[in-house]
């Protein structure tokens, strides 16, 4: 029997305020790697996480 593709997939979360903010602590964009269950959350994931470049908790959105 062939194995099916797993329900859990790896996604990347990217800080939304790093793109717009010019007065940051350091250059770059904060990214987190995590997993999500396709069956429970079919739409794009948004989480509030700490951004080391902005030095505050910001919204991180799922990217492709």
UniProtKB/Swiss-Prot annotation:
Key words, A-Z: Chloroplast, Plastid, Ribonucleoprotein, Ribosomal protein
Superkingdom field: Eukaryota
Localization: Plastid, Chloroplast
Gene Ontology molecular functions: structural constituent of ribosome
Major location (coarse): plastid
GO cellular component, one term: ribosome
Example GO BP: translation
One Pfam family hit: Ribosomal_L33
The keyword Metal-binding appears for this protein: no
SUPFAM superfamilies cross-referenced by the UniProt entry: Zn-binding ribosomal proteins
Similarity annotation: Belongs to the bacterial ribosomal protein bL33 family.
NCBIfam families (UniProt xref): PRK00504.1 (NF001764), PRK00595.1 (NF001860), rpmG_bact (TIGR01023)
Protein name: Large ribosomal subunit protein bL33c
Naturally occurring in which organism (per UniProt): Mesostigma viride
